[in-house]
A protein has these predicted regions:
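Short, small-residue-biased leader/transition segments that mark boundaries at the very start
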Residues: 1-2
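A non-catalytic, amphipathic alpha-helix used as a structural packing/dimerization or gating element
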Residues: 6-16
Length: 124
């Protein structure tokens, strides 16, 4: 239901963190940025998408990982992104909410409601 908002705001957060780390702004509008994000978010074969959907339905982190023989990069990357956002004093609401769902047992429905109730502002 909120897929377009999450993808758009998610790209903004990824870009914000990447630029803080010294990345080129243009990287995020090309194949390795938005191109990869679109495939990850829309492909039925994406481990990260499937794991995220399961997380959103209430499955716990450890339950999800038990079913994968390969790495679900998004889970580990979420932990690193939160640490980096704290280091650079960045406000990354999606990353923080996902982290709370993954590692602090926050209800995913509450996390989504909090994200969608945020004030609208420029995402460029």
């Amino acid at each position: 239901m909120y897929k377009r908002q999450i993808i758009t705001r998610g790209l903004y957060e990824i870009k914000k963190l990447g630029i803080a780390l010294g990345a080129n702004h243009d990287t995020f509008t090309g194949l390795s940025g938005i191109g990869d994000l679109i495939v990850t978010c829309t492909s039925n074969h994406s481990r990260n998408r499937n794991a995220g959907e399961r997380l959103g339905k209430g499955e716990k982190y450890n339950q999800i990982l038990e079913n994968y023989l390969m790495v679900v990069e998004g889970f580990d990357n979420c932990e690193a992104a939160v640490k980096l956002s704290n280091k650079f004093n960045l406000n990354l609401p999606i990353i923080n909410q996902v982290h709370q769902v993954l590692f602090q047992n926050k209800d995913p429905k509450i996390a989504m409601t909090e994200l969608m109730n945020r004030s609208a502002k420029s995402e460029i």
